[in-house]
Amino acid sequence: MNAEIVWRPQPRQAEFMRRPEPEALYGGAAGGGKSDALVIEALRQVHIPHYRGLILRKTYPQLSDLVDKSMAYYKRAFPTAQYNATSHVWVFPSGAKIYFGSMQYTKDRTNYQGKAFDFIGFDELTHFEWEEYSYMMSRNRPTGPGTRVYLRATTNPGGVGHGWVKARFITPAPPGTPIVEQFPVRMPDGTEKVLERARVFIPSSVFDNPALLENDPDYLASLASLPEAEKQALLYGSWDSFSGQVFTEWRNDPGHYQDQRWTHVIAPFAIPRHWKIYRGYDFGFSKPFSVGWYAADEEGRLYRIKELYGCTGRPNEGLRIDPVEQARRIREAEQNDPMLKGRTILGVADPAIFDESRGESIAAMMERGPHFLHWVPGDHTRLAGKMQFHYRLAFDGEGRPMFQVFSTCRHFIRTLPNLVYDESNVADIDTRQEDHIYDECRYVLMENPISPPRQTVQPPVGDDPLELHRRARFYRV
């Protein structure tokens, strides 16, 4: 008697499922069979009695599709397996268990405190924040001898976690190439040992799922008919253009760094001594603090010429240094930079640093000697500030915007394009993101407001570094 084949992976699904790295992300575009691969992958060790697996979605209602898939596959593969709809857990003949869970709010991660899972799968990883993902890494540990411990995730571009997911899995290496990170650990005997942990991104698209295209020939046309940004993300898997992106007008074209046309990122140049200089500041302790220096030319165009970003290198994690030390670093940066040394600089900061309700304000601490760093409170009006970004990012007939960024300001270039809208307040950005540079810059823009441009011009199709107006190129693995 021939055994029934419950599920057969497509080639790209098989590539994802055979990867040895402790972390792997699968997806990019829609229709690649991401959720099916995740649900099946969780079954790999159900022959081990003490095995525990966990599949997560951001909210409980979003779990229903995954549970439905498990109903279709698990019962056929293991007829005596039982699903408990109250506790959302499958119990297999060996005693192994696969749980389905959610984490709507970051505080919900404590629901998993003290628990261990050999396998953890995240469906739609960009819906999660870094703090949630990193906490669950600590829950990913063996429940007993003989189990493999690893994390798997699937996602499309976009969502509140787009920035950190892109920085962790997409930017560091080409698809299919292991990203190896080293961690020094001090051992009990005082020696230092360097440990390594690898992760990888496996791209997929609807073209990797011929079974779907055969069953639903119109699905490809449905993706192709989406608005441009959404089509680039869901059809072609673009991480530079996606649904929910706030600043879709942002352009970073190295081919125009020198002539400064049709790009917001430009090559650094010497700042004339008569231009005004501004310094923006957003305080942070456990989250990053951000300082940006800006020059204003005779036409009112602003240039971000330098930045100081207080982060550890991990997503949205601050250096935890006090205001006085931050002031010292800011003053040191100005004294060591020929563009800034000896110049009059107007500092504009988050109004919250002037709060004296709990004692001496942050602004007062920074203004004391020996650093004497003076600030004026910035305009914190959020929607008006966001519109100043749109007004200044617009291109005129000659391809010049009213705001440009030196190519050395890598954290600005990294974070601004990743900002997404708040689903609860669709006119504003989602503040759960790494938005500290955006806030700091907003105070400077509001100090120098401009009127809406009378006419804006779209970049020529030939000047298209993100390939938003042509078929996207596919990564080869």
Name these PLM-found stretches.
Residues 35-49:
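Walker A/P-loop NTP-binding motif
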Residues 61-118:
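Inter-Walker segment of RecA-like/P-loop motor cores
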Residues 1-22:
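Pre-P-loop entry segment of helicase/translocase ATPase cores
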Residues 127-209:
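ASCE P-loop NTPase helicase motor core
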Residues 51-63:
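Conserved RecA-like ASCE P-loop NTPase motor core of nucleic-acid helicases/translocases
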Residues 123-124:
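Walker B catalytic acidic pair
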Residues 208-283:
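ATPase catalytic-site recognition across NTP-hydrolyzing enzymes
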Residues 292, 300-433, 449-456, 460-461, ...:
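Mg2+-dependent endonuclease catalytic cores in nucleic-acid-processing enzymes, primarily RNase H-like
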